[in-house]
Amino acid sequence: MKIIKVTDLNLKDKKVLIRSDLNVPIKNGKIMCNMRIIKSLETINFVIKNEAKCVIVASHLGNPIEEKYDYNFSLTHIVNHMKKIIKYPIRLIQNYLNGFEAKEKEIIVLENVRFNPGERKNDKNLSKKYANLCDILVMDSFGSSHRSESSTTGIIKFAPISCIGLLFLKEIKYLKKALFNSKRPIVTIFGGSKISTKLGVIEKLSNISENVLVGGGIANTILFSKGHNIGKSLHDKNNISKIKKFLYKKNIIIPKDFIVTDNINKFSSYKEKSIKEIKNEDYIVDIGKKSCECFIKIIKKAKTIFWNGPLGLIEIKQFRNGTKEIANSVIHSSAKSIIGGGETVLAMRMFNFIDRFSYISTGGGAFLSFIEKQELPVLSELKKFKKYTNFKQN
């Protein structure tokens, strides 16, 4: 069934709630990467220019404990940043579930939806309260569309009209095109610390990619599954059986050497070792020189590159080199490059490479989930929405 787009609707004099993705990395109150905020503005501006009576923006930020306000997770930081880059008045509201008053042409930002009890559990009553705030719901948060929560899938069931936003639509259109109309060879790069969420998509992309290059916790888990000593390195013992499904695929390339340390901090000394040289007290924190050379050789031949997750511990400067070297080879290749995931985007911003990729997705888990299944819980709900399937502009 066709999904209603925000461009299909007459927004004039309507209360419009936009579920955006403003979940950005913040350190000591400072926004480290504002990409998601910037990309969300297209839909917000579209709604304002089409004369909505009230523009309401909702988002989550991080993983606070439900029912407990925590300033570190407050959207105060986001709103203060938005005030600098948008010309309309913006106001943050903390208590909004029972309604509120808004001035004309004012943007209302709702405080972190994850402060609300029941949000993560997709509570029906909470979903209804969100829906009661608007005439039209615009689902624009691609980054959280793989989650079934009250402000994602739940609200769609109860909003008078539910539609898809401009950013969300761009994401799925681009990723579909990249998946099904990509030039070959296709090379996929996987790293990062989140392992279990990537196993399905690794298997999927290993079937359509000429090569899959892995680092980080995923490489460690594969090495551990093969019986290698990885010392104290990050790995996922709970998913060994799933890893074994693609353990010996010839197109999955794991590092041959590593940067290791016996103490993880910014003053740590480190050594380069082969897998056979790793000791019980070692932590693998980056890929080594030989692995970089091997990966770069493969990347040079690629025509399409998918990338999710850094290859080393990028939080510490001396363990970023592997990720930086590989990123440098990607941006200087002739390949179309598609990256996704918060850590990946943050790393590229650190290296000042952020504008050098063909496409940067705002999704991490959603990016992976859509690549794996070409479907998302939020998309499924939007397809079910039948109340106004014949609703026309004006």
Curated annotation (Swiss-Prot):
Protein name: Phosphoglycerate kinase
Catalysed transformations (reactions): (2R)-3-phosphoglycerate + ATP = (2R)-3-phospho-glyceroyl phosphate + ADP
PROSITE patterns noted in UniProt: PGLYCERATE_KINASE (PS00111)
Organism: Wigglesworthia glossinidia brevipalpis
Lineage per the UniProt record: Bacteria, Pseudomonadati, Pseudomonadota, Gammaproteobacteria, Enterobacterales
EC number: 2.7.2.3
Residue numbers binding substrate: D21, L22, N23, R36, H60, L61, G62, N63, R114, R147
GO molecular function: ADP binding; ATP binding; phosphoglycerate kinase activity
Protein family membership: Belongs to the phosphoglycerate kinase family.
GO BP terms, alphabetized: gluconeogenesis; glycolytic process
Record InterPro entries: Phosphoglycerate_kinase (IPR001576), Phosphoglycerate_kinase_CS (IPR015911), Phosphoglycerate_kinase_N (IPR015824), Phosphoglycerate_kinase_sf (IPR036043)
One GO CC term, this protein: cytosol
Pathway: Carbohydrate degradation; glycolysis; pyruvate from D-glyceraldehyde 3-phosphate: step 2/5
Top-level taxon of origin: Bacteria
Binding annotation for ATP: K198, E315, G341, G342, E343, T344
Record keywords, A-Z: ATP-binding, Cytoplasm, Glycolysis, Kinase, Nucleotide-binding, Transferase
SUPFAM superfamilies to which the protein is assigned, alphabetical: Phosphoglycerate kinase
Protein localization: Cytoplasm
Top-level enzyme category: transferase
Keyword Cell wall biogenesis/degradation carried by entry: no
Subunit-level organization: Monomer.
Primary localization: cytoplasm
